[in-house]
Regions:
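Small-residue helix/turn framework positions
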Residues: 51-63, 95-97, 102, 119, ...
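Long, internal scaffold/assembly segments composed of regular secondary structure
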Residues: 256-258
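Short acidic, Gly/Pro-enriched loop/turn segments at secondary-structure junctions
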Residues: 80-86, 102-114, 436-440
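A short, compositionally biased domain-edge/stem linker segment
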Residues: 78, 82-88, 298-307, 412
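Extracytoplasmic assembly/pore-lining segments of large envelope/extracellular complexes
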Residues: 330-332
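N-terminal Sec-pathway targeting helices
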Residues: 1-4
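Intrinsically disordered, low-complexity segments enriched in small/polar residues
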Residues: 288-307, 454-456
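Terminal hydrophobic membrane-targeting helix
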Residues: 6-96, 235
Length: 510
Protein backbone atom coordinates (compact mmCIF):
# COMPACT_ATOMS: atom_id res chain seq x y z
CA UNK A 1 0.00 0.00 0.00
CA UNK A 2 2.77 2.42 0.96
CA UNK A 3 4.58 1.52 -2.25
CA UNK A 4 1.51 2.45 -4.28
CA UNK A 5 1.17 5.74 -2.38
CA UNK A 6 4.83 6.56 -2.98
CA UNK A 7 4.49 5.72 -6.65
CA UNK A 8 1.45 7.99 -6.93
CA UNK A 9 3.22 10.83 -5.15
CA UNK A 10 6.30 10.51 -7.35
CA UNK A 11 4.08 10.47 -10.42
CA UNK A 12 2.21 13.59 -9.36
CA UNK A 13 5.28 15.56 -8.31
CA UNK A 14 7.02 14.76 -11.59
CA UNK A 15 4.40 16.85 -13.38
CA UNK A 16 4.39 19.72 -10.87
CA UNK A 17 7.25 22.24 -10.83
CA UNK A 18 7.17 24.02 -7.42
CA UNK A 19 9.20 26.91 -8.88
CA UNK A 20 6.02 27.98 -10.67
CA UNK A 21 4.57 28.91 -7.27
CA UNK A 22 7.48 31.15 -6.16
CA UNK A 23 5.71 34.41 -7.20
CA UNK A 24 2.58 33.37 -5.31
CA UNK A 25 4.61 32.58 -2.18
CA UNK A 26 6.36 35.96 -2.39
CA UNK A 27 3.02 37.73 -2.85
CA UNK A 28 1.50 36.06 0.22
CA UNK A 29 4.57 37.05 2.23
CA UNK A 30 4.18 40.64 1.05
CA UNK A 31 0.58 40.68 2.23
CA UNK A 32 1.96 39.85 5.70
CA UNK A 33 4.54 42.69 5.71
CA UNK A 34 7.44 40.37 4.81
CA UNK A 35 9.55 41.19 1.75
CA UNK A 36 10.58 37.79 0.34
CA UNK A 37 12.80 36.97 -2.63
CA UNK A 38 13.35 33.31 -3.55
CA UNK A 39 16.58 33.41 -5.56
CA UNK A 40 17.34 29.68 -5.71
CA UNK A 41 15.45 26.57 -6.81
CA UNK A 42 12.43 25.02 -5.17
CA UNK A 43 12.73 21.26 -5.47
CA UNK A 44 10.98 18.14 -4.26
CA UNK A 45 12.68 16.01 -1.61
CA UNK A 46 11.83 12.31 -1.25
CA UNK A 47 14.31 10.92 1.27
CA UNK A 48 14.44 10.53 4.17
CA UNK A 49 11.00 12.18 4.09
CA UNK A 50 8.83 13.71 1.45
CA UNK A 51 9.13 17.46 1.37
CA UNK A 52 10.24 20.61 -0.38
CA UNK A 53 13.66 22.27 -0.35
CA UNK A 54 13.96 26.00 -1.04
CA UNK A 55 17.42 27.43 -1.75
CA UNK A 56 18.73 30.99 -1.27
CA UNK A 57 15.94 32.99 0.36
CA UNK A 58 16.34 36.71 1.02
CA UNK A 59 13.89 38.51 3.31
CA UNK A 60 13.32 41.66 5.38
CA UNK A 61 10.61 43.40 7.40
CA UNK A 62 10.26 46.20 9.94
CA UNK A 63 12.62 44.54 12.46
CA UNK A 64 14.93 42.51 10.18
CA UNK A 65 16.70 44.95 7.88
CA UNK A 66 18.44 42.16 5.97
CA UNK A 67 18.03 38.40 6.25
CA UNK A 68 18.91 35.36 4.20
CA UNK A 69 18.64 31.56 4.38
CA UNK A 70 20.80 29.16 2.39
CA UNK A 71 18.20 26.40 2.54
CA UNK A 72 14.72 25.88 3.98
CA UNK A 73 13.42 22.30 4.12
CA UNK A 74 9.77 21.47 4.94
CA UNK A 75 8.76 17.81 5.18
CA UNK A 76 5.46 15.96 5.59
CA UNK A 77 4.70 12.49 6.93
CA UNK A 78 2.96 10.01 4.66
CA UNK A 79 0.20 9.43 7.20
CA UNK A 80 -0.44 13.17 7.32
CA UNK A 81 -0.81 13.23 3.54
CA UNK A 82 -3.49 10.52 3.71
CA UNK A 83 -5.67 12.97 5.63
CA UNK A 84 -7.23 15.21 3.02
CA UNK A 85 -8.98 17.43 5.57
CA UNK A 86 -6.37 20.18 5.50
CA UNK A 87 -6.85 23.56 7.19
CA UNK A 88 -4.71 26.09 9.05
CA UNK A 89 -4.84 23.99 12.21
CA UNK A 90 -4.22 20.69 10.45
CA UNK A 91 -1.35 21.19 8.04
CA UNK A 92 0.46 18.06 6.77
CA UNK A 93 3.82 19.40 7.99
CA UNK A 94 6.09 17.12 10.02
CA UNK A 95 9.31 19.11 10.27
CA UNK A 96 10.87 22.46 9.34
CA UNK A 97 14.59 23.02 9.00
CA UNK A 98 16.56 26.22 8.40
CA UNK A 99 20.16 25.83 7.25
CA UNK A 100 22.75 28.63 7.58
CA UNK A 101 20.63 31.71 8.00
CA UNK A 102 21.66 35.30 8.65
CA UNK A 103 19.66 38.22 10.00
CA UNK A 104 20.36 41.83 10.92
CA UNK A 105 18.04 42.87 13.75
CA UNK A 106 17.15 46.52 14.25
CA UNK A 107 15.25 48.15 17.10
CA UNK A 108 14.52 51.78 18.01
CA UNK A 109 17.30 53.50 20.00
CA UNK A 110 19.53 50.39 19.86
CA UNK A 111 22.52 49.42 17.76
CA UNK A 112 21.81 46.82 15.04
CA UNK A 113 22.67 43.23 15.95
CA UNK A 114 23.91 40.74 13.37
CA UNK A 115 23.00 37.05 13.80
CA UNK A 116 24.98 34.51 11.76
CA UNK A 117 25.01 30.73 11.34
CA UNK A 118 21.31 30.54 12.18
CA UNK A 119 20.02 26.97 12.38
CA UNK A 120 16.44 26.03 13.26
CA UNK A 121 14.97 22.56 13.68
CA UNK A 122 11.26 21.87 14.30
CA UNK A 123 10.13 18.25 14.56
CA UNK A 124 6.71 16.68 15.14
CA UNK A 125 5.11 19.93 14.04
CA UNK A 126 1.59 20.33 15.36
CA UNK A 127 -1.01 23.05 15.80
CA UNK A 128 -3.56 20.97 17.68
CA UNK A 129 -1.82 20.93 21.08
CA UNK A 130 0.64 18.14 20.35
CA UNK A 131 4.23 18.41 21.57
CA UNK A 132 6.61 19.92 19.03
CA UNK A 133 10.37 19.74 19.49
CA UNK A 134 11.98 23.10 18.79
CA UNK A 135 15.65 24.04 18.74
CA UNK A 136 17.58 26.95 17.29
CA UNK A 137 21.11 28.27 17.38
CA UNK A 138 23.03 31.26 16.05
CA UNK A 139 26.16 33.31 16.55
CA UNK A 140 26.27 36.99 17.47
CA UNK A 141 29.18 39.46 17.63
CA UNK A 142 31.19 37.20 15.35
CA UNK A 143 31.09 33.84 17.08
CA UNK A 144 29.36 34.32 20.44
CA UNK A 145 27.03 31.28 20.55
CA UNK A 146 23.29 31.46 21.23
CA UNK A 147 20.92 28.50 21.45
CA UNK A 148 17.41 27.66 22.60
CA UNK A 149 15.60 24.36 23.05
CA UNK A 150 12.03 23.70 24.16
CA UNK A 151 9.09 21.38 23.88
CA UNK A 152 6.33 23.54 22.44
CA UNK A 153 2.60 22.85 22.33
CA UNK A 154 0.65 25.08 19.94
CA UNK A 155 -3.12 25.35 19.84
CA UNK A 156 -5.14 26.82 16.97
CA UNK A 157 -8.72 28.06 16.85
CA UNK A 158 -9.07 27.41 13.12
CA UNK A 159 -7.97 30.89 12.12
CA UNK A 160 -4.95 31.72 14.24
CA UNK A 161 -2.85 30.27 17.10
CA UNK A 162 -4.50 30.90 20.47
CA UNK A 163 -2.15 29.26 22.98
CA UNK A 164 1.56 28.47 23.22
CA UNK A 165 3.03 26.35 26.01
CA UNK A 166 6.82 25.98 26.15
CA UNK A 167 8.23 23.45 28.61
CA UNK A 168 11.78 22.16 29.16
CA UNK A 169 12.91 25.59 28.00
CA UNK A 170 16.67 26.08 27.95
CA UNK A 171 18.27 29.27 26.67
CA UNK A 172 22.05 29.51 26.38
CA UNK A 173 23.97 32.69 25.66
CA UNK A 174 27.62 31.71 25.58
CA UNK A 175 28.35 30.90 29.26
CA UNK A 176 24.89 31.96 30.52
CA UNK A 177 22.13 29.37 30.86
CA UNK A 178 18.45 30.03 31.66
CA UNK A 179 15.85 27.31 32.27
CA UNK A 180 12.10 27.37 32.78
CA UNK A 181 8.67 27.22 31.20
CA UNK A 182 6.27 29.74 29.63
CA UNK A 183 2.55 29.50 28.93
CA UNK A 184 1.01 32.13 26.65
CA UNK A 185 -2.73 32.65 26.20
CA UNK A 186 -2.80 34.66 22.97
CA UNK A 187 -6.55 35.30 23.05
CA UNK A 188 -6.40 36.99 26.46
CA UNK A 189 -2.89 38.46 25.98
CA UNK A 190 -1.69 36.63 29.11
CA UNK A 191 1.79 35.13 29.59
CA UNK A 192 2.63 33.14 32.73
CA UNK A 193 6.01 31.60 33.37
CA UNK A 194 8.95 30.80 35.57
CA UNK A 195 12.64 31.20 34.73
CA UNK A 196 15.79 30.48 36.69
CA UNK A 197 19.49 30.20 36.16
CA UNK A 198 22.38 28.28 37.68
CA UNK A 199 25.40 30.23 38.89
CA UNK A 200 26.72 32.63 36.26
CA UNK A 201 30.24 34.07 36.26
CA UNK A 202 29.41 37.50 34.87
CA UNK A 203 33.01 38.63 35.20
CA UNK A 204 34.24 35.83 32.94
CA UNK A 205 31.40 36.45 30.49
CA UNK A 206 32.30 40.14 30.25
CA UNK A 207 35.89 39.19 29.42
CA UNK A 208 34.65 36.88 26.66
CA UNK A 209 32.56 39.71 25.21
CA UNK A 210 35.51 42.09 25.35
CA UNK A 211 37.59 39.69 23.23
CA UNK A 212 34.94 39.90 20.52
CA UNK A 213 34.16 43.61 21.03
CA UNK A 214 37.43 45.43 21.86
CA UNK A 215 35.54 48.73 22.26
CA UNK A 216 33.73 47.18 25.23
CA UNK A 217 35.59 47.93 28.48
CA UNK A 218 35.43 45.81 31.62
CA UNK A 219 34.95 47.79 34.84
CA UNK A 220 37.78 47.61 37.35
CA UNK A 221 36.43 46.37 40.68
CA UNK A 222 38.04 46.23 44.10
CA UNK A 223 37.08 42.61 44.75
CA UNK A 224 38.53 39.82 42.60
CA UNK A 225 35.38 37.76 43.23
CA UNK A 226 32.86 40.48 42.35
CA UNK A 227 30.20 39.26 39.88
CA UNK A 228 31.56 35.70 39.84
CA UNK A 229 28.43 34.08 41.33
CA UNK A 230 25.16 35.48 39.99
CA UNK A 231 21.88 33.59 39.65
CA UNK A 232 18.16 34.32 39.80
CA UNK A 233 14.66 32.91 40.16
CA UNK A 234 11.83 34.69 38.40
CA UNK A 235 8.06 34.20 38.25
CA UNK A 236 5.79 36.40 36.18
CA UNK A 237 2.25 36.88 34.98
CA UNK A 238 2.05 39.39 32.14
CA UNK A 239 -1.10 40.83 30.62
CA UNK A 240 -0.45 43.36 27.87
CA UNK A 241 -3.98 44.73 28.29
CA UNK A 242 -4.36 44.66 32.09
CA UNK A 243 -2.55 43.76 35.32
CA UNK A 244 0.93 42.20 35.36
CA UNK A 245 3.21 41.17 38.20
CA UNK A 246 6.79 39.98 38.42
CA UNK A 247 8.59 38.40 41.38
CA UNK A 248 12.35 38.07 41.15
CA UNK A 249 15.01 36.80 43.52
CA UNK A 250 18.43 37.96 42.39
CA UNK A 251 21.56 36.60 44.08
CA UNK A 252 24.81 38.50 43.52
CA UNK A 253 27.85 37.04 45.26
CA UNK A 254 25.69 35.65 48.11
CA UNK A 255 23.73 38.92 48.41
CA UNK A 256 19.99 38.46 47.94
CA UNK A 257 17.83 41.13 46.29
CA UNK A 258 14.04 40.73 46.24
CA UNK A 259 12.43 42.57 43.35
CA UNK A 260 8.68 42.82 42.85
CA UNK A 261 6.99 44.70 40.02
CA UNK A 262 3.29 45.40 39.55
CA UNK A 263 2.05 47.10 36.39
CA UNK A 264 -1.48 47.92 35.30
CA UNK A 265 -2.16 48.94 31.71
CA UNK A 266 -5.66 50.17 32.60
CA UNK A 267 -4.38 52.76 35.09
CA UNK A 268 -0.94 53.35 33.58
CA UNK A 269 0.77 52.75 36.94
CA UNK A 270 3.84 50.64 37.71
CA UNK A 271 5.14 49.94 41.23
CA UNK A 272 8.60 48.47 41.79
CA UNK A 273 10.11 47.38 45.10
CA UNK A 274 13.75 46.40 45.64
CA UNK A 275 14.83 45.15 49.08
CA UNK A 276 18.05 43.65 50.38
CA UNK A 277 19.72 42.98 53.70
CA UNK A 278 23.22 43.93 52.59
CA UNK A 279 25.02 45.29 49.55
CA UNK A 280 28.83 45.39 49.54
CA UNK A 281 29.06 48.38 47.23
CA UNK A 282 32.82 48.78 47.73
CA UNK A 283 33.40 45.40 46.04
CA UNK A 284 32.10 46.79 42.74
CA UNK A 285 33.90 50.15 42.80
CA UNK A 286 37.50 50.79 41.68
CA UNK A 287 40.11 49.84 44.31
CA UNK A 288 40.90 52.49 46.91
CA UNK A 289 43.60 54.83 45.63
CA UNK A 290 42.83 54.22 41.96
CA UNK A 291 41.21 56.91 39.79
CA UNK A 292 37.51 57.19 40.52
CA UNK A 293 35.03 56.30 37.80
CA UNK A 294 31.75 58.18 38.15
CA UNK A 295 30.31 56.36 35.13
CA UNK A 296 30.97 53.00 36.79
CA UNK A 297 29.35 54.16 40.02
CA UNK A 298 26.34 55.39 38.08
CA UNK A 299 26.10 52.12 36.14
CA UNK A 300 25.64 50.17 39.38
CA UNK A 301 22.41 52.02 40.11
CA UNK A 302 21.34 52.44 36.47
CA UNK A 303 18.91 49.45 36.62
CA UNK A 304 16.74 51.54 38.98
CA UNK A 305 15.97 53.80 36.01
CA UNK A 306 14.66 50.95 33.82
CA UNK A 307 11.01 51.26 34.93
CA UNK A 308 11.00 54.93 33.90
CA UNK A 309 12.59 54.09 30.54
CA UNK A 310 10.52 51.01 29.68
CA UNK A 311 7.12 52.08 31.05
CA UNK A 312 5.22 54.84 29.28
CA UNK A 313 2.96 55.60 32.26
CA UNK A 314 3.78 56.67 35.81
CA UNK A 315 6.27 54.63 37.82
CA UNK A 316 7.08 54.36 41.50
CA UNK A 317 10.28 52.72 42.76
CA UNK A 318 11.02 51.95 46.40
CA UNK A 319 14.52 50.86 47.41
CA UNK A 320 15.23 49.52 50.89
CA UNK A 321 18.64 48.19 51.98
CA UNK A 322 19.54 47.45 55.59
CA UNK A 323 23.26 48.05 55.05
CA UNK A 324 25.44 49.32 52.21
CA UNK A 325 29.11 48.83 53.01
CA UNK A 326 31.78 51.11 51.59
CA UNK A 327 35.54 50.81 51.96
CA UNK A 328 35.71 52.87 55.18
CA UNK A 329 32.12 53.29 56.39
CA UNK A 330 28.61 51.91 56.06
CA UNK A 331 25.22 53.34 55.19
CA UNK A 332 22.39 51.74 57.16
CA UNK A 333 18.61 51.69 56.93
CA UNK A 334 18.56 53.19 53.44
CA UNK A 335 15.12 53.92 52.03
CA UNK A 336 14.35 55.87 48.88
CA UNK A 337 11.24 56.47 46.80
CA UNK A 338 11.19 57.70 43.21
CA UNK A 339 8.00 58.71 41.39
CA UNK A 340 7.45 59.98 37.88
CA UNK A 341 7.84 59.32 34.19
CA UNK A 342 10.81 59.03 31.86
CA UNK A 343 11.17 62.83 31.49
CA UNK A 344 10.16 63.99 34.98
CA UNK A 345 11.23 62.16 38.14
CA UNK A 346 10.71 63.11 41.78
CA UNK A 347 12.78 61.78 44.66
CA UNK A 348 10.09 62.09 47.31
CA UNK A 349 12.13 60.47 50.06
CA UNK A 350 15.73 59.50 50.75
CA UNK A 351 16.60 58.50 54.30
CA UNK A 352 19.72 56.82 55.64
CA UNK A 353 21.85 56.48 58.76
CA UNK A 354 25.54 57.16 58.20
CA UNK A 355 28.59 58.43 60.06
CA UNK A 356 26.72 58.57 63.36
CA UNK A 357 23.92 60.74 61.96
CA UNK A 358 21.19 60.84 59.37
CA UNK A 359 20.77 61.93 55.77
CA UNK A 360 17.42 63.05 54.36
CA UNK A 361 16.81 64.42 50.89
CA UNK A 362 14.20 65.22 48.26
CA UNK A 363 14.77 66.15 44.62
CA UNK A 364 13.20 66.71 41.21
CA UNK A 365 14.72 65.96 37.80
CA UNK A 366 13.04 67.55 34.78
CA UNK A 367 14.14 66.26 31.36
CA UNK A 368 11.26 67.71 29.37
CA UNK A 369 13.22 70.68 28.01
CA UNK A 370 16.33 70.69 25.86
CA UNK A 371 18.39 71.62 28.92
CA UNK A 372 17.68 69.26 31.85
CA UNK A 373 17.00 70.92 35.19
CA UNK A 374 16.85 69.79 38.79
CA UNK A 375 16.17 70.86 42.35
CA UNK A 376 17.80 69.22 45.36
CA UNK A 377 17.13 69.59 49.09
CA UNK A 378 19.51 67.48 51.23
CA UNK A 379 19.52 67.63 55.03
CA UNK A 380 22.24 66.29 57.35
CA UNK A 381 21.63 65.73 61.05
CA UNK A 382 24.26 65.14 63.78
CA UNK A 383 26.97 63.76 61.47
CA UNK A 384 30.00 62.73 63.53
CA UNK A 385 32.84 64.64 61.88
CA UNK A 386 35.52 62.46 63.45
CA UNK A 387 33.95 59.43 61.75
CA UNK A 388 33.56 61.39 58.52
CA UNK A 389 37.16 62.59 58.39
CA UNK A 390 38.46 59.16 59.35
CA UNK A 391 36.42 57.57 56.56
CA UNK A 392 37.29 60.16 53.92
CA UNK A 393 40.89 61.08 54.79
CA UNK A 394 42.08 58.38 57.16
CA UNK A 395 42.65 60.94 59.94
CA UNK A 396 40.15 61.80 62.72
CA UNK A 397 41.70 65.24 63.17
CA UNK A 398 38.39 67.10 63.10
CA UNK A 399 35.48 66.39 65.42
CA UNK A 400 32.01 67.65 66.21
CA UNK A 401 28.41 67.08 65.18
CA UNK A 402 27.48 68.56 61.81
CA UNK A 403 23.91 69.47 60.93
CA UNK A 404 22.70 71.49 57.98
CA UNK A 405 20.64 71.71 54.88
CA UNK A 406 20.55 73.32 51.48
CA UNK A 407 18.00 73.96 48.74
CA UNK A 408 19.66 74.25 45.36
CA UNK A 409 18.56 74.19 41.73
CA UNK A 410 20.44 73.96 38.47
CA UNK A 411 20.17 73.47 34.74
CA UNK A 412 22.43 72.03 32.06
CA UNK A 413 23.76 68.89 30.44
CA UNK A 414 27.40 69.06 31.53
CA UNK A 415 29.26 69.72 34.76
CA UNK A 416 30.51 73.22 33.90
CA UNK A 417 27.07 74.44 32.80
CA UNK A 418 25.45 72.98 35.90
CA UNK A 419 28.01 74.56 38.24
CA UNK A 420 27.56 77.94 36.56
CA UNK A 421 23.76 77.71 36.87
CA UNK A 422 23.52 76.64 40.51
CA UNK A 423 21.25 78.77 42.67
CA UNK A 424 20.41 78.08 46.27
CA UNK A 425 20.80 78.81 49.94
CA UNK A 426 21.48 76.80 53.05
CA UNK A 427 22.94 76.81 56.52
CA UNK A 428 25.04 74.60 58.73
CA UNK A 429 26.15 74.25 62.34
CA UNK A 430 28.75 72.16 64.11
CA UNK A 431 28.27 71.43 67.80
CA UNK A 432 31.44 70.96 69.87
CA UNK A 433 33.84 71.39 66.94
CA UNK A 434 37.39 70.35 67.70
CA UNK A 435 40.70 70.39 65.80
CA UNK A 436 42.99 67.89 67.46
CA UNK A 437 46.23 68.74 65.63
CA UNK A 438 46.73 72.31 66.87
CA UNK A 439 45.45 74.81 69.44
CA UNK A 440 44.21 78.05 67.85
CA UNK A 441 44.10 79.91 71.19
CA UNK A 442 47.71 79.02 71.90
CA UNK A 443 48.75 80.12 68.41
CA UNK A 444 46.97 83.49 68.79
CA UNK A 445 48.49 84.11 72.25
CA UNK A 446 51.98 83.26 71.05
CA UNK A 447 51.59 85.54 68.02
CA UNK A 448 50.38 88.40 70.23
CA UNK A 449 53.28 87.86 72.62
CA UNK A 450 55.79 87.98 69.77
CA UNK A 451 54.32 91.24 68.48
CA UNK A 452 54.45 92.81 71.97
CA UNK A 453 57.95 91.53 72.65
CA UNK A 454 56.88 89.55 75.71
CA UNK A 455 56.91 85.86 76.49
CA UNK A 456 53.78 83.74 76.20
CA UNK A 457 52.84 82.01 79.42
CA UNK A 458 50.12 79.65 80.46
CA UNK A 459 49.20 76.09 79.69
CA UNK A 460 46.90 75.07 76.86
CA UNK A 461 45.01 71.90 76.24
CA UNK A 462 45.88 69.79 73.23
CA UNK A 463 43.87 70.67 70.17
CA UNK A 464 41.28 73.38 69.68
CA UNK A 465 37.82 73.21 71.21
CA UNK A 466 35.48 75.75 69.62
CA UNK A 467 32.06 76.97 70.56
CA UNK A 468 29.26 76.02 68.19
CA UNK A 469 30.29 76.86 64.63
CA UNK A 470 27.58 78.30 62.37
CA UNK A 471 27.42 79.59 58.83
CA UNK A 472 25.27 80.27 55.79
CA UNK A 473 25.62 78.87 52.28
CA UNK A 474 24.81 80.59 49.00
CA UNK A 475 25.18 79.22 45.46
CA UNK A 476 25.35 81.73 42.58
CA UNK A 477 27.44 82.49 39.47
CA UNK A 478 29.52 79.35 39.78
CA UNK A 479 30.45 80.15 43.38
CA UNK A 480 29.70 78.70 46.77
CA UNK A 481 29.78 81.55 49.28
CA UNK A 482 30.03 80.59 52.94
CA UNK A 483 29.07 83.66 54.93
CA UNK A 484 28.25 84.49 58.51
CA UNK A 485 30.83 82.03 59.85
CA UNK A 486 30.61 82.49 63.60
CA UNK A 487 32.29 80.72 66.52
CA UNK A 488 34.46 81.43 69.55
CA UNK A 489 37.37 80.10 71.59
CA UNK A 490 36.82 81.13 75.16
CA UNK A 491 36.66 84.95 75.05
CA UNK A 492 38.04 85.08 71.52
CA UNK A 493 35.28 85.65 68.96
CA UNK A 494 35.90 84.34 65.44
CA UNK A 495 34.10 85.48 62.33
CA UNK A 496 34.75 84.71 58.71
CA UNK A 497 33.66 84.39 55.14
CA UNK A 498 34.75 81.98 52.45
CA UNK A 499 34.29 81.70 48.70
CA UNK A 500 34.69 78.56 46.62
CA UNK A 501 35.11 79.09 42.87
CA UNK A 502 33.64 75.76 41.76
CA UNK A 503 34.65 75.96 38.09
CA UNK A 504 38.21 77.24 38.71
CA UNK A 505 38.49 75.10 41.87
CA UNK A 506 39.82 78.01 43.93
CA UNK A 507 39.17 78.66 47.62
CA UNK A 508 39.52 81.89 49.61
CA UNK A 509 38.97 82.49 53.33
CA UNK A 510 38.60 85.90 54.97
Amino acid sequence: MLALIMAAIVGITSFVDPNDYAPDIEAVAGDNQLILDIQGDISWQFFPQLGISVKRIVFSNNVISAGSIDELVITAGLLNLLNTDFDQANLPIDSIKVVNGRARYIAPNLLPVQFDNIAISINNFSLDGGETDFSASAAVFGDLPLSIEATVALSHDGQKPNRVNATNLQLNVDQISINGHINADLENAQIVGKLSSPSINIRRQLKAIQLKLPIFSIPVMASATALTDVHFNSEFSINSKGYSNYTHQLFIDNQKFDVTVEADQTTGLMNTSVTSNQFRLHDYLPPQGSPSNNMQTGAIFAPLALPFVMWSGESQIELSVNEITMQTFSVRNLYSRLVGRANFIQLTSLNADLLGGQLNATAEFDLRDKQPSFTLQPQLNTIDLSQAFLALTGNPDVGGELSGGVAVSGIGDNLVTIQQSLLGIGQFSVINPIFSTFNVEQTVCQSAAMLSGSNSSGSFAAGTQLDTLEGNLNFADGQLIISGINTAIGNLKLRGRSTVQMIEQRYTLN
